[in-house]
């Protein structure tokens, strides 16, 4: 199915800038009409994990809309083995450099500075005893499925009506599922006051469109709700610069996807981590090594 013509007209108007202090729905409706505004907002529900992206800052939504509809090969890279393989490589490299990694240990106080705190804001609030560590984020129901493979299953589905999304990740990386099976992951932003069960029912209807007969083919299933764990959302009048600062003072630095750093989704975490690490190195009085790192 092709996207609405009004939406196509909108995303090809790439030289326009959007205001920070207006909501996206009213701004986009004024320039492109209500149909395009609704379709664009629902498309952006996929990358904001929010059921009503139209309420967000027009500049925030517009930047992301232009990113995800850019007329060039997508920036997505599928790493063989998934994120767990990336984390394993990072951990191995860190240990090679002398980093001591402890897992399964509860952290209830900060060590001597300089220190980097890389966690979601609710946990950072408690650890830093700082109630100002707040920002808006999404709320979405998640569904992971293992199904028997069948020809004709969709690789990806974007729901322009309800902002849902589905992707069959074992298509580009067959190592994610046993032979003859597929790994499917889907998400649906929850509406205000909507229960997990109601959100799952809407999401399951989307799954049926992309993976017909999935219920009788399912060999493994899990579901969850992600609340405040899907990145920062900027309301009208706010930008990434208004989010909680990376440098908290006294040698404490905060990194994550809801702090004052630019980027889309995981890019915020990466950019904030680089800035926080540089700040910590400087606070420790260590000369920063700018030599390129072997990859």
Question: What name fits each language-model region?
Answer:
Residues 27, 43, 89, 275, ...:
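Alpha-helical scaffold segments in soluble metabolic enzymes
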Residues 63-111:
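Helical element adjacent to the flavin cofactor pocket in flavoenzyme catalytic cores
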Residues 105-196, 243, 294:
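Mid-domain catalytic core of redox enzymes
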Residues 101-103, 117, 254:
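A structural signal for the hydrophobic beta-strands that form the central parallel beta-sheet
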Residues 17, 21, 33-38, 79-83, ...:
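Generic structural signal for well-ordered, non-membrane alpha-helical segments
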Residues 169, 175-295:
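Conserved flavin/dinucleotide-binding core of flavoenzymes
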Residues 1-66, 73-78:
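Rossmann-like flavin
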């Amino acid at each position: 199915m092709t996207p609405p013509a009004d939406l196509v007209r909108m995303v090809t108007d790439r030289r326009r800038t959007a205001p920070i202090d207006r909501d996206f729905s009213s701004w986009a409706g004024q320039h492109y009409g209500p149909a395009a505004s609704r379709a664009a907002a629902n498309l952006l529900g996929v990358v904001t994990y929010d059921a009503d992206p139209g309420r967000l800052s027009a500049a925030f939504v517009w930047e992301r809309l232009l990113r995800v509809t850019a007329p060039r090969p997508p920036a997505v890279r599928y790493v063989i083995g998934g994120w767990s393989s990336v984390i394993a490589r990072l951990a191995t490299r860190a240990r090679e450099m002398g980093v001591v990694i402890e897992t399964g240990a509860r952290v209830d106080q900060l060590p001597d500075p300089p220190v980097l705190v890389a966690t979601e804001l609710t946990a950072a609030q408690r650890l830093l005893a700082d109630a100002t560590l707040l920002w808006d984020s999404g709320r979405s129901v998640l569904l992971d499925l293992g199904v028997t493979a069948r020809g004709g299953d969709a690789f990806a589905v974007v729901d322009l009506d309800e902002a849902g999304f589905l992707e069959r990740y074992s298509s580009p990386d067959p190592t994610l599922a046993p032979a003859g099976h597929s790994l499917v992951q889907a998400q649906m932003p929850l509406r205000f006051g909507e229960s997990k069960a109601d959100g799952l029912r809407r999401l399951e209807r989307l799954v049926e469109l992309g993976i017909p007969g999935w219920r009788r083919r399912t060999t493994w299933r899990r579901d969850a709700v992600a609340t405040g764990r899907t990145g920062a959302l900027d309301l009208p009048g706010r930008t990434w610069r208004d989010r909680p600062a990376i440098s908290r003072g006294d040698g404490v630095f905060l990194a994550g996807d809801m702090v004052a750093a630019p980027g889309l989704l995981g890019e915020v975490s990466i950019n904030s981590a680089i800035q926080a690490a540089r700040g910590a190195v400087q606070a420790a009085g260590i000369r920063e090594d700018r030599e390129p790192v072997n990859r």
